[in-house]
């Protein structure tokens, strides 16, 4: 993660031929720049402290809950644990160092930390984002291949190793292209003596812009696409499963109403061999017929071998009219007219409706939770990436007076994702929620 002054000084460092003019003209701008957040520094300190503590404690609880159930390892829980660990690193590396640089207007941690800390900040944020992609891919695989789901702990280890390798590889240019700059040499003022700033020093602007665009693609656009595709697939599968469940319950209701008429309607009909054959036929082919507007009529007796040849095609009409005039409802060939449930089927129908309502409520809950996951990621990280892109292409669009304030707002929104990830991936996860509740009770006692 870049420091807030990088874009401002990259242009100054690239114009070394005009150093004298820069010293005379930029010093008043530095004073104006320095006073941009002085009125809000206590508010920023309190806000950063609150966000950091909330993110640290929430992710620490997730780690403790997952460590408690180590005997029930799953790939998703393993990834959620690594997500909590990477979010803790984001809180530890990004919040204190960034806030200190913003409020004190200098880098106080030495030359070595100037090369290491931006690299660690970038790696922690990138790893957290790549783990979100991994969780989305695993969920997509579990939905598309529920029966052949053979993801083991080794697959989780492989995913985590790949994620950390990609994080180190993508962020590897940052230690090379960061340098410590003395402000007295840059601005030519004795008031800025012994003050240093850690800034990016790319060979040219094109390198810096290329790196910013790469981070935008890997840290924002790619995760957003993966989360959207995966969670859309999950919601669609749940919706299809709900539809199949509802259809199956309605079909069972139709057959139960047909096979078990009300006791008030008369004596039970004893099924003959042909009726049993017709019942097995409707069970086998019940999905071909309409669920709510289908009933069954009595099946004709199967003709014997002796009079089979006597049944001529012209007699089919009379047989059909004879069947349609019957008033008994026993298993047979379905026809399309509305069936009215008997009184003794009210309890069964009520159970069916309650089951379908419960499944619909659960599916809506999953849909809302997955939608919130996508929105939280999109809203929290979009301002910071837009800020870096805008300042890299044209740093004059944001005035020096409001530069640090805008950066702090964007940076705090990004940090909020570290506070919300434990809630979205941990506290709303039914498998982890019970362990979290028991853990909180133990800590409270």
UniProtKB/Swiss-Prot annotation:
Brain; hypothalamus. Its main location: membrane. Glycans are attached at residues 10, 17. GO terms for cellular component: GABA-ergic synapse; neuron projection; plasma membrane; presynapse. Keywords: Cell membrane, Disulfide bond, G-protein coupled receptor, Glycoprotein, Lipoprotein, Membrane, Palmitate, Receptor, Transducer, Transmembrane, Transmembrane helix. The chain crosses the membrane at residues 43-63, 78-98, 118-138, 157-177, 209-229, 370-390, 408-428. A lipid is attached at residue 442 (S-palmitoyl cysteine). Disulfide bonds join 114-198. Residues 64-77, 139-156, 230-369, 429-445 are cytoplasmic. It comes from the Eukaryota. One of its GO terms (biological process) is outflow tract morphogenesis. InterPro entries: GPCR_Rhodpsn, GPCR_Rhodpsn_7TM, NPY5_rcpt, NPY_rcpt. Residues 1-42, 99-117, 178-208, 391-407 are extracellular. GO terms for molecular function: neuropeptide binding; neuropeptide Y receptor activity; pancreatic polypeptide receptor activity; peptide YY receptor activity. SMART domains: 7TM_GPCR_Srsx (SM01381). Receptor for neuropeptide Y and peptide YY. The activity of this receptor is mediated by G proteins that inhibit adenylate cyclase activity. Seems to be associated with food intake. Could be involved in feeding disorders. This is Neuropeptide Y receptor type 5. The gene is NPY5R.
């Amino acid at each position: 993660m870049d420091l807030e002054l990088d874009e401002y000084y990259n242009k100054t460092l690239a114009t070394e031929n005009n150093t004298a003019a820069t010293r005379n003209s930029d010093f008043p701008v530095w004073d104006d720049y320095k006073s941009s957040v002085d009125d809000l520094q206590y508010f920023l300190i309190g806000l950063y402290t609150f966000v950091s503590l909330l993110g640290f404690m929430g992710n620490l609880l997730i780690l403790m809950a997952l460590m408690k159930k180590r005997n029930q390892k799953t790939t998703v829980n393993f990834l959620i644990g690594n997500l909590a660990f990477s979010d803790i690193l984001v809180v530890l590396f990004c919040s204190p160092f960034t806030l200190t640089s913003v409020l004190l207007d200098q880098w106080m941690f030495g030359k070595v930390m100037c090369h290491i800390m931006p690299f660690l900040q970038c790696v922690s944020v990138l790893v957290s984002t790549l783990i979100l992609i991994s969780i989305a891919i695993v969920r997509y695989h579990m939905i598309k291949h529920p029966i052949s789901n053979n993801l083991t702990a080794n697959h989780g280890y492989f995913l985590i190793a790949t994620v950390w390798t990609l994080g180190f590889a993508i962020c590897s240019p940052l230690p090379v292209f960061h340098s410590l700059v003395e402000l007295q040499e840059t601005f030519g003022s004795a008031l800025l003596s012994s003050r240093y700033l850690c800034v990016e020093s790319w060979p040219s602007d094109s390198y810096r812009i290329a790196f910013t665009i790469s981070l935008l693609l890997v840290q924002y656009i790619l995760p957003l696409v993966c989360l959207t595709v995966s969670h859309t697939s999950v919601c669609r599968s749940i919706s299809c499963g709900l539809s199949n469940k509802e259809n199956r319950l309605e079909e069972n209701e139709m057959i139960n109403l047909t096979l078990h008429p009300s006791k008030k309607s008369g004596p039970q009909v004893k099924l003959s061999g042909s009726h049993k054959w017709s019942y097995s036929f409707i069970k086998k082919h019940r999905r071909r017929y309409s669920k709510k507007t289908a009933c069954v009529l009595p099946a004709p007796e199967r003709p014997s071998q002796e009079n089979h040849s006597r049944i001529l095609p012209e007699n089919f009409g009379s047989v059909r009219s004879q069947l349609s005039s019957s008033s008994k409802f026993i298993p047979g060939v379905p026809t399309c007219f509305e069936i009215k449930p008997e009184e003794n089927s009210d309890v069964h129908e009520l159970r069916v409706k309650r089951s379908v309502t419960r499944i619909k409520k659960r599916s809506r809950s999953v849909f809302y939770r997955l939608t919130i996951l996508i929105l939280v990621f999109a809203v929290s990280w979009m301002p910071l990436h837009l800020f870096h892109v805008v300042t890299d292409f044209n740093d004059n669009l944001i005035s020096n007076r409001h530069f640090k304030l805008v950066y702090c707002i964007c940076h705090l929104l990004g940090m909020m994702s570290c506070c919300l990830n434990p809630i979205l991936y941990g506290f709303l996860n039914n498998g982890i929620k019970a362990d979290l509740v028991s853990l909180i009770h133990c800590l409270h006692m």
